[in-house]
């Protein structure tokens, strides 16, 4: 997926949209992600021992994140493939070679996913072990916010808080807290806090005081690209999907330091010692051209997608994992005007193909609007659709029902979070569908004047001022390989952090592996708790991977792919008997436990 931006706009200002635009962490999971590709790589292993594995669910794609604490593993039972049996599996791993099911915590109507963490907090109100989980509503009775459980006795967890979080939306009170994509908690001495990924608002960094877990309260919320505009990368033009996806907080030299994975704004370092007054420390930019594909001879723009990151044990480095499920990017132009069209692929072209045709304005293409006129089956016609009122899927269905079109381009609506902003899109249908393009580009296709200032002020045209059925400029769209998501090694420093190296599995930037071998993007990294140079990766169908930092480079030193393939989501280290083990969650199976056996 390649996306772009004309002018300066924030991709997630205001309240989150529900039409399929990708402007929050949860929306990334709807974009043919987390299980969109079949097949797998062949079984192989090197310097990694499989200690044990335990099947937890027979439904493919049901298992999500994993956390480990004091001899127990906690695995999310996700709602992305159905809302049945959502909750948290508790697994006894006190004997890593013989894991066994210990308990299940149901979350009826809601589903945890990325946010699974257990820790000890000791405050005046509570002294014990807690589990924090995120909630994304998937069915009746679901709640948003986070859940907090007392797992001091892991076999008999007790609910301390259910569905607590931000109970406002656009400054209006709501009955349910905002849905959240992830959560991370920390003990700050006499107080304890948790940070939540708000899926529904531009202020998507929500910080809760959980000193008394049964009385958790919201103490601050931030829109990082508004609070710290220096994190927004000016070029290339495609880095516009700006929102929080995940984060960790670590005590470094007595300060609570967060690394926030802020998608197309990269990785952001913040001092959150005082949650009510957070301070900017540094952030990353995505190198252009993208350095990892360049190693394979490809010259492409960086994808962005800062998904998850961790500090190394010695805090010298930050390792970031970019999640990218689209190995093909889009190039698009207005042929008549010889100008770029900045849009992503909602429904992609066939890999390596192109589509060129004349444009036809079809309005909003919503049910009840002016009917979409039929295209000409004898020519290549591209339906140009205005965003607004209904979902992208409804628009596509109406264009397809009209017949005669070969592709669809959606351009943006009015609104403070729209106008000349560009966003990705989640949509279902058959015809290749591109968008969401900046509003000015939609107007230009039909030679209409446009003022972004008027659009943002609400004084510009509320609809493209041409009749439905009007023909416009020629446009061309082409698909090119740009590879899967991969990892970065950054120096932990103030200001713009230096990118030292990138790491991808060999298949990740080989067009021969663009389909038929599963999702070959990285998902998460867990750094070693005993060595400063080791890191472990959950690499979806790429398996379990181990890297070592050598001379400021990420070098693979081990891997494991099971017979029949893997689909790893989460990864977490834990100690046992003086040895470091690694728990990994396989989305289609359950829990794997590994040990790195390479040279020390």
Where are these regions (language model features)?
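Feature marking well-ordered beta-strand scaffolds used for ligand recognition
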Residues: 5-334, 383, 393, 465-600
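Structured lumen-facing ectodomains of secretory-pathway proteins
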Residues: 328-480, 491
